[in-house]
Amino acid sequence: MVDTKCYMPTYCLYFTQRRCEYIYIYNSPNFFSDFIRKNKKNKRPNIYQLIFQRLLIILYLCALVIRWRYGLFFSGRLVRERNMFSKELKEECGVFGVWGVPRAAEVTYYGLHSLQHRGQEGCGIVSVNDKGELQRVKGLGLVTEVFNTENLGSLHGDMAVGHVRYSTHGGGGIENVQPFLFRHNSGDFALVHNGNVVNSAQLRKYLEDRGSLFQSTSDSEILAHLIKKEPVERNSPRIIPIMEALNMIEGAFAFMVMTNHRIYAMRDKYGLRPLSIGRIGDGYVLSSETCAFSVVGAEFVRDVEPGEVVTIDHHGIRSRKYSDYQRHAMCAMEYIYFSRPDSDIEGRNVHSFRKESGKILYRESHVDADIVVGVPDSSLSAASGYAEASGLPNEMGLIKNRYIGRTFIQPSQEMRDKGVKMKLSPVRSIVKDKRIILVDDSIVRGTTSLRIVRMLREAGAKEVHMRIASPMIKNPCFYGVDMSTHKELLCYSRNLEQARQAIEADSLAFLSEEGLFEAGHRSDLCLACFNGNYPTALYSSIEEVNEEHKF
């Protein structure tokens, strides 16, 4: 039976006939062949059956028209529209793993809570019970929506991996929610992934030509098929096929692979996505961010290094490098926007980074004003730094409604236009007749910035000076951030003055790249979205960008 809770968001159509039952999801390309095959039993269809068949065809064609009209083919847009009130920029996901800790699934549940900001479309947990069997619970929605006492209690054992997802590649849908679970003659294993594989199209074709059958459109599944294609004796370590598979993958990733005995954790050779190791008693935890460690009572041990494969089992922690080439190129947006302020990334606290960037931003582009206002939530640290450096009061001029932003309703244009007002509200008594320094972490498409500036003016602000605690985003990201084309970026085809006019601010300034390095106390960051210097080859990703400019 189809899980209606999981599939209703993708608009299932249910039809029942007297002699056969149809459960048809209009994503299926085999609908007509299945329908005809099932009706061959009806030698002499009556008038009601003929009418019913024609109604089905009409409904099917209507569904196709709707998908074409709203651009839904292969885009996963229906799922993304649930986040229509959220901030412009989205990161793909967060991963969490537990080894050797009693009630590991429960620990993973709390860990995923702490990583919820990294993905809100779906989540899942796989655990290993006392018999060595892998058990899974996953679904669409927040951690609190997917898990309850009953299904969480069904996940036994002292090993588990979990995942929270936001789709930037492969679209939405329950089939793309991780962890992925794979059956293999050498033993079952589960896989979770944060990042993006830039040569996924080539690898998928390579694997399909050799007989691989994919159960999702997510590029995360590619690693599993690369591992499976190598012969491995049952219950033997998978480290060799894993390392061989990783050398075929290009891009940004933090993977975890869990068998019935051990967990393998690995980062790409550039270190674009974070992954840290913590300890609870005699057991270990792994997380995309260190903020989850304090919640589960873990002590930070170290970060997984770029190009490293860590094996955790009853022998403890063992380490191997899958590539002779390693370099640190942590995604700058992890510090600027994605990570929680209480997380530490490779030795640098996120809040401290953002606050320091705010101070440097004032030094580089100060202007006369009355108050400083940060855009909730990720810009508040930078706003406090700007206010401290300038001596201006740091006011809460914008209030965030935390209960807006998740809906399964396809919104109208009017609802979209009201989206920012529903999520952010100005405090009129604070902003009225004031010259405001409005601090935000970044500008991607500019639509949110424009609406906030207009909102503050409507609330009585005399002037609104926009200050951005990062450089101008001019290039797409192919490493797991939801900005994949040039044309959607405000600053790609505009200079500073044109960007200012587009968002209707009185002035606009961005943090320099040098200021970003100074705030992070490091220069080994990936700034590809700012300066176009991509640390990896781009393969099919750059082909998509070139295709965009053909017209």
Regions inferred by a protein language model and the residue ranges of each:
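Polybasic, lysine-rich low-complexity intrinsically disordered segments
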Residues: 5, 38-42
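Phosphate/diphosphate-binding loops
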Residues: 429, 434-448, 454, 492-505
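Short, glycine/charge-rich flexible loops or terminal/linker lids adjacent to PRPP-binding catalytic cores
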Residues: 391-437, 447, 474-481
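PRPP-dependent phosphoribosyltransferase catalytic core
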Residues: 246, 261-262, 279, 297-303, ...
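Compositionally biased low-complexity segments enriched in histidine and/or tyrosine
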Residues: 3-10, 14, 19-29, 62
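Conserved short alpha-helical segments that host acidic/polar catalytic motifs at enzyme active sites
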Residues: 76-306, 311-369, 375, 463
